[in-house]
Amino acid sequence: MKLDVNKQYSGFVIRQAAYIDEIQSEAYVMEHTYSGARLLYLGNNDDNKVFSISFRTPPYDDTGVAHILEHSVLCGSRKYRLKEPFVELVKGSMNTFLNAMTYPDKTMYPVASRNAKDFQNLMDVYLDAVFYPLIYENPYTLRQEGWHYNIEAPTDALSYNGVVYNEMKGVFSSADALLDYEAMKALFPDTPYSFESGGHPDAIPELTQEAFEHFHTTYYSPENSFIYLYGDMEIETTLQYLNDEYLSGFKRTGAVNSEIPLQNAFARTQEVLGTYPVGADEATEDKTYHELHIVTGDARDVKTSMALRVLESVLLEGNSAPLRLALLQSGVAKDISGSYAGSYRQPIFSIKAAGSKPEQRDKFISIIYHTLQQLTINGIDRELLEAHLNYLEFKLREADFGAYPKGLIYGISVMDSWLYDGDPLAGLRYTEALQQLREGIKTRYYEQLIENYLLDNTHKVIVTLNPEQGKEEREQEVLAEKMAVLKASMDTETIAQNIELCSELHKRQAAADTAEALETIPLLERSDIRREVEVTETVLKQLGTNDILYVPAFTNKIAYLNWYFDLTGIDKDLLPYCYLLSDVLGKFNTDKYTYQELATASNKYTGGVSFQMHAYSAADDANDYTIKFTVQAKALTANLDKLFDILQAVALGSKIDDAKRLQEILDEVNTDWDSSFFSRGQTVACTRLASYFSTAARVNEQDQFSYYEFLKELSADFAGRAEDTLAKLRQLLGIFFESSKYLLAYSCEESERMLVLEQALNFAALLPQSAVAGKTPQFLEAPGENEGIMTPGKVQYVAAGGDFHKFGYQFHGAMKVLETILRYEYLWTKIRVQGGAYGATARFDRNGTMFFASYRDPKLKESLQAYYDMPSWLEKLELSERELTKYIIGTISGLDTPLTNSMRLEQAGVYHLKQVDTAMRQQMRSEIIDLTNADLQKLAPLIRDTLSEKYLCVVGSSQSIEANKNIFTKTQHI
């Protein structure tokens, strides 16, 4: 139904109403007059409903109070007096999204669900949490989620522990986080942005209970809130609920002052010099970062923000970006990247050089200014501007956000203006702004943007971070000395008090919630779950030795193609070069395009073209696999001829003969690995672990730590290996694109099905036959066993696992429920709550692979012991019918995530390659829904036997790995 402007509904007055064509939604901006709460409702027929409540939460120090509070309000509330209602919701709701996020100036609490009853339950738990948390009566919440003194006996060393404390230790292990921290302090010295809202590990222990409570009292009130609703719902009923249950209990006071002030511009560019940690023996040459940050305009100016986003993309993203090219060709750095951060009161335009030298800073700045000045004089390439505008429009209209609900992303994006008292609808109405930006191509609009915001603007900071050997170890020593001095200053009584507090915290963490408390969390019934597996309609046909898989869908005139070319029989010694070729494809000149022209054409005519390699194991056997080179592409069907022209140029016309160009690409990939290695820690640990016992995983691991090592070795002797490497890449190019054995999976509208297929087959007809397609794979040897991979980080990623098929066990749907139980009960309690890690996961695959892994974990051997103790815990596990139902619902929720067109196509293709049929999926779903305690307990010996081989891999701090080196077969520094 439609709501009328200026009319009141359950205390809400409609201030603005409009239909937003771009997202096909009726939009209503409202105000709750009694409490002062703001509300935006986007009404449409999307059953994936979204609710969010956000608060403006500007930090006033580095203690991370906003972040810790975000964790803590979800640890029990007035109605839901459990230790962690949030976790109970994760365990047992049908949510399609459930999380909370701390930003530099706001905190958001969003939920989403397709089930109306479940959606109401989620909304109520979250509202009760933010307005009535138990933090005022339970000081142990701050100790658990924020920080506490960790000491269990008088002779123990004193240390800090806490979930957020350890999370932020992990965050600040990366150079990127340190760059951002230094930049924000310098860019906004007089505003809340100068503080780290997530918390700095050095400052988190300064947060007191009083300051913690004061922050909640100050900012968590309806008049400082932004409520967002999206989707198909009874809006009048929802408004009445919000008013009656929550908002009517809070009278607007006018006392909340959370406005984000503007930072005055500087008279001149500010300079910051700092260091970041690398290993004690790690080389430091070419590892300096330089980053120029420029404050640009006002977040509420949607057109300018969109234009600056396009300009950043034009200047700095892709192989045709002129500023990026100028910097790379000057040799100032090995990799150049840019970003536009529009979710600040004053957005930030950034240009980063990675893999540089300290003395290159002035040259970095000089080239930026010279290049920008030349662009304002000579003009930006109009085709380049058009290409990036086309790509932006494609992404906006496609609105494919992967597993994230569309309504969630809209809710986050409206905050870019709404949070600063701007129009929340402005960013959703992009058509007019896009048209104005297209008109700007005909004028000097973009050149004037460069002049006004990038050249003449003095609100800038240049940050330089140099690598410092052994910095992490020295900081740990300083912290240990500080803690020793602190403990020495404590009298016996104070030490005893801290031991008692630590002991009491552990008791509370280990204690189970009462049945009465658990039953306050609303729960669906098993009967609410759809028993039948959701089946994607597909049409499979064979053309000779090739398979064609069509997935019908409404795609808004977009064609999606996933092309899997068979490489199974490839020489195993060539596998590292296969992954390298996947990285360099499209980045060399071709017989028709320069690599810059190719990048422009791709942006102009497609929604993206990507290349990757992967080994797909059969559903029930990790050692029966095929290797596929995959091309993923999408384009408007009107541009299909352009898409295949691009693919033909890459497949048949790539000139892989330029050693200098290969060196440039290698430098970029190497530098990216260096800067992101620690953030990839869990993936590195888990893929390396799986490679110890799975031949398919050994192939895929060639794209992880083995690839990192391969790149380093190749770069170290590039002059001696360049020609051989180029020759191997040319050889592989003739094998990658082949017509002997492939799977073409594609999706488009039925009316365009034959058009898409005809053009695809015309392209395939040009491709050569292959000598490796359809052959038996050459098995790789395991790269090692039980490795400790040492980084300059402060925390660990601890993985252990094995192959349960080896011991005669078969996959069962109960394993997927056990994943949920372990992630959010056993491992959550042992690894996160008691151990202080940010998180932990569990995985059981049909192919026999099983692993457990922790994330940003301050512990090492304790986490391994938790894995080894798991079977004994599981043998004694007796869940009530309600608890079983809860975990079943939570598991099904993960399986029933709504799929976008591209996700549905990929799923169909992978199921085909892995030989997963509907009957297998239905059997698993039935086993999940019909789960019993006995099914779970049967898995205890499976875990015990599989872990008995003691396969493990740890990525983390050198100190922790050195202290536990006896458990490793091999340790090494990155």
Regions found by a protein language model. Give the residues of each.
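A structural supersecondary motif
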Residues: M94-T96, E291-T296, L316-G355, S413, ...
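Non-catalytic accessory/assembly modules
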Residues: K2-V5, G76, F131-L134, N138-A177, ...
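Acidic/histidine-enriched segments that form metal/cofactor-coordinating
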Residues: K2-K7, G76-R78, P85-H214, M306-R309, ...
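His/Glu-based metal-binding/catalytic segments typifying zinc-dependent metallopeptidases
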Residues: L40-N45, S52-S54, Y165, K169-S173, ...
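Short, Gly/Pro- and small/polar-rich lid/capping loops
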Residues: K2-V29, I529-V539
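C-terminal regions of mature proteins
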Residues: K2-L3, G231, H388-G544, I548-P552, ...
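A generic structural motif
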Residues: T57-P59, S113-K117, G231-I235, T296-R300, ...
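N-terminal cofactor/phosphate-binding cores enriched in small/glycine residues
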Residues: Y28-N115
